Each structure stands twice: as structure tokens, then as C-alpha cells.
Amino acid sequence: MGKFQLITKGLIKENPTFVLLLGMCPTLATTTSAINGMSMGLATTFVLILSNIVISAIATYIPDKVRIPSYIVVIATFVTLLQFIMQAYVPDIYETLGLFIPLIVVNCIVLGRAEAFANKNSVGDSALDGIGIGLGFTCSLTVLGLVREILGSGSAFGFKFIQGDGILAFVLAPGAFLALGYLIVIFRKLTSKKAE
């Protein structure tokens, strides 16, 4: 697989949200706005890239029996680092995302890429895989957050452009399921036409 394909596969072919349906907890819970979705996606991307690099570099030294716990320790280290950085530089976003930042440790996207890709490939390829999957996750969370924000409150990225109240359901959990379902259908329809 070429270097460019390692990055682009996460955007379309192996999109974590719309194709693989991974990471649904943060996807549904943090996408009440485009900014929240983008922030969660970027936070996950940061951890994904760095953990892929380290896991790929040390994969040959990790015994099979402690492989998964070792991955969790590596991922938890980067999540802790991320928490410190976010608390220092973007405290408002850190407060908004709250509990979902520490939950990146057990996010199946990050663990899945460590197990399925990083431990079997080179450091460079693992970094590119992390970038691609992370960008795909970030884009899908941002789009979902944007749709929910527009329909739920009549704003985009915090800028109100529709007067009056939006559709309350889209700000709440049921709206997350509805918006995600429709976006999955649209994404799959568009990608199936592209494949033909």
C-alpha cells in the first residue's frame, strides 16, 4: 500500500465512524457542536499518531501475553499528556469534553489501530496510518457536530445564522442517532457511486 493510500484510506475506505462504526461513545456524546466534534477528533488523532509510532517502535519487545495491557499503558501515557496540554492551553474545550478525554485510553479506534496495524508495520507507515484514521475520525465528528448544531440551534461553529429555536431533538441524544444514521446512509451512497 502506498504512502498516500495510508492517509486517504482513513478518510473514505476505512472511515472509523461512517464505515467501521467504531468509537460510537465519543461520536454520539461529544458532537453537540462542530467545535466539540473537531476538538474530540483532534484529541483522538494526537493520541492515535503518537501511540501508533511508539507501539510500532517497541512491538518486537512486547511479549504476546502482555500485548494489550502494554498498548493501554502507552495510550494512557499520551492521553495524560494530552490532558495536561488541554488544561493548560484550551481549558474551555477541556471542560466541555470532560470525561471523554480520559476515555480515549480505551477507545476502540486507538486500540484497534495499535493491534491491527501499528504492531505489524514500520514506524513511518504507522504514523501515516494514525494521521489518516485520525483525520477521518476528526472529519466525521466535525460533520456530525455541524449537522447537529445547524439543525439544533441554527448556528455553525458557534456563529448563529438562523433566528429562533432549532429542533431540540438534534441537540439531545436522539438527534445524535438520527443525524449519524442519515450521515452514514449519505456517506455510503456517495462512496458506493464512487466505487462504481
Regions of interest found by a model, annotated:
Residues 5, 125-196:
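C-terminal transmembrane helix-loop-helix hairpin of multi-pass membrane proteins
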Residues 7-17:
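N-terminal membrane topogenic signal
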Residues 22-28, 44-45, 49, 76-83, ...:
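Hydrophobic core segments of alpha-helical transmembrane domains in multi-pass membrane transport
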Residues 34-50, 94-105, 174:
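Structural signature of hydrophobic alpha-helical transmembrane segments
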Residues 35-52, 56-73:
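Loop-to-helix transition at the N-terminal end of transmembrane alpha-helices
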Residues 51-64, 111-121, 186-188:
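C-terminal ends of transmembrane helices
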Residues 63-75, 96-102, 126-129:
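Cytoplasmic-side transmembrane-helix entry/capping segments in multi-pass membrane proteins
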Residues 81-96:
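Transmembrane alpha-helix boundary signature
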